[in-house]
Amino acid sequence: MGSCQSNENSEGNARNKEIEKQLNADKRAGSSIVKLLLLGAGECGKSTVLKQMQILHSNGFTEEEVNEKRAIVYNNTVSAMCTILRAMDGVLHLPLENGQKEAEKAIVMKVQENGEEGEALTEEVSKAIQSLWADPGVKKAFEMRSEYQLPDSAKYFLDNCQRISEPGYRPNDQDILYSRVATTGVVEVKFKIKELDFRVFDVGGQRSERRKWIHCFDNVESIIFITAISEYDQVLFEDETTNRMIESMQLFNSICNSTWFLSTAMILFMNKKDLFMEKIQRVNITTAFPDYEGGQNYEEAVSFIKQKFAELNLNPDKKTIYMHETCATDTNQVQLVISSVIDTIIQKNLQKAGMM
């Protein structure tokens, strides 16, 4: 595992240097290059949006990428169950309702302890995960997931465990969209639309990653800032004293009003609307916004959050914030939103070139 991590870091560093070199070259290139920067706090859905752009505009995933994602899917499936089981033993103090499933728990936990969670799921491991996922105690722990760090994709992978463990399994686009590995450094997707070369960059969302890269992108055309509106009752992975929504707003404030991006268009994706729609019925947004006095319904709550973000813009006369409610794993919905964003950017480029 240590060697694997070292290789990943080495490859990431090489990729980052290459991208930085290309960014400098782009500054000397013509105006046909349009650079978009994806920003947001960790786990907001940036990488999923980038993967959607790859599906929609860049010929999807290569066979090599699909093979890489297979190991990530296996990892995400095992890790999801192990995270729930550890939370049951720890912060939740919840037992398995069926005590006879302790043996199955040991089988799954051993996979992670041995560092084998990225390997194909054996029939024994798959059946153990499916059996545990059906346990009422595990279901209760899942419902209490805001009290510990559980990725949003956990339910998807646990629901699909049987299919994922079949011999010859090949991840489909939806599996890849839900797959999750923390972004380090910068990841890039390129595509061409109407004679414009788009280059989209996803910068790591954890605090340490953001600090490393922000200065490299002072000449981007637009920033797509992504906030996970469903995370108003959750805390950061890297700082469990900070509310995720508040962190996201603080980051948006610093980017929107940064001297690096005074003339850069701001596009706000209010992501994970599907999870927000379900959660708002159970948990009021007063968790993050004590001054909220509206109803516990989607329309009022989203409108309030939009207003909160709009108020962070210190130059509303000069800078417009384009807001979209999104579900990054819904390809059809994301296609409509991204098409709208790209059309807006193309119009601005034509205006800049004096062609409108």
Swiss-Prot record:
Keywords: Cell projection, Chemotaxis, Cilium, GTP-binding, Lipoprotein, Magnesium, Metal-binding, Myristate, Nucleotide-binding, Olfaction, Palmitate, Sensory transduction, Transducer. PROSITE patterns: G_ALPHA. Residues 175-183 are annotated as: G2 motif. A lipid is attached at C4 (S-palmitoyl cysteine). Expressed in sensory neurons in the head and tail. Expressed in amphid AWC neurons, to a lesser extent in AWB and weakly in AWA, ASH and ADF neurons (head sensory neurons). Expressed in phasmid PHA and PHB neurons (tail sensory neurons). It is found in: Cell projection, Cilium; Cell projection, Dendrite. CDD domains: G-alpha. Belongs to the G-alpha family. Guanine nucleotide-binding proteins (G proteins) are involved as modulators or transducers in various transmembrane signaling systems. This specific G-alpha subunit plays an important role in olfaction and in cilia morphogenesis. Involved in chemotactic responses to attractants diacetyl, pyrazine, 2,4,5-trimethylthiazole, benzaldehyde, isoamyl alcohol, butanone and 2,3-pentanedione. Displays a redundant function with gpa-3 in chemotactic responses. Plays a role in the avoidance response to the noxious chemical quinine in ASH sensory neurons. This is Guanine nucleotide-binding protein alpha-17 subunit. It comes from Caenorhabditis elegans. The gene is odr-3.
